[in-house]
Amino acid sequence: MNIDTGEEKLQLAFRKGTIWRKIIVSKTVLASSNKVTELAGSGIAVTSQNARAFIQYISDMENMNYYLIPEKKSIGRFGYIPDEGFSPFVDGLIFDGDANFKAMFQTVRSRGSETKWLETAAEVREMSTTVKIILAASFASVLLEPLNCLPFFVHLWGVDSGTGKTVALMVAASVWGDPAVGAYVKTFDGTVVGMEKTAAFLNNLPFCLDELQLAKDSKGRTTFDVYKLAQGVGRTRGNRSGGVDLTPTWRNCILTTGESPLTGTASGAGAVNRVIDIECKSAQAVIKDGMRISGAVKRNYGFAGRKFVERLYQPGVIDQVSERYRELFRILSDRDTTEKQAMAAATIILADELAC
């Protein structure tokens, strides 16, 4: 049963040749002769001719073995789960979400040596303040929910090559899982709907996007809209049954890179307040020896994020974190800045203090 929606699903096991396969299917699909034929695409031999018999067979099997079939808790996203913990760090929790996100769900894991990752993180932190900021922002992503803060962007940009922007993004992603571009790190080459769904899937984990220039039109203008992700709420969309789909929501940090700023002279004040734009130049590289550093975090990743979350669940920690956040927010708000900018800066500083 999905602990977010309460929807029940069944795991079906079937054999193709000598190989057993498993698939998790919604009971809504298994109750409709029109929908159940979609399982043919997964390799199950169901057709429009035998659909009714197949549905009856599955129903009978479930009813006859109801007390023998184990019930598992499932989830289709990352992040905080009320009364349960933080996905995917909940024991016994299985993924039952969109099949397109299954591969990404599996990227959030530990691999290699925690000691080597810590050594690499300590080394890159000494290379530039920019690395400290984006690394801290990666941790800060999971603070937004308990602190009731809004999503915000940290964007590294620069026209010079070899500044280490992408490697810095990979270091930030390695806090949680496989930092390879195409694994946990995605690119701007996608649709608005796709980005909304990915943001909702990540939920409280950082959304890492590389290469802003991929989101430009034929005239070289950036088509990416900061507001689409910074609001933390997707569009309400209708469905075929005449109702509306569940409105996607998220509360995380969006970490990005590109050759140009994420905001410009034409951007509204609201967009500017939601983005921390950091220019990167080759004369002052964000990360030196990028090939070696990227290789190190590709081999060793996924340790720090879990430990950071586990610390937040310790008794009294959230209260202490909230008090420190309010203190930092007051200090920053007294300066020449807006509340949204102070909020983003306070969470980054706080995350850096907690992670060190």
What is each of the regions a protein language model found here?
Residues 131-146, 154-155, 166-174, 193-199, ...:
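Contiguous, well-ordered alpha-helical segments that form the cores/surfaces of helical PPI scaffolds
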Residues 211, 251-261, 279-282:
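A short beta-strand-to-loop transition that corresponds to the Sensor-1 phosphate-sensing loop
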Residues 1-126, 197-198, 202:
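Conserved glycine-centered beta->alpha loop in an early N-terminal alpha/beta scaffold
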Residues 200-202, 239-256, 271:
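AAA+/SF3 P-loop NTPase mechanochemical coupling elements
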Residues 167-220:
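AAA+/P-loop NTPase substrate/partner-engagement loops
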Residues 93-181:
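P-loop NTPase catalytic core of nucleic-acid-dependent motor ATPases
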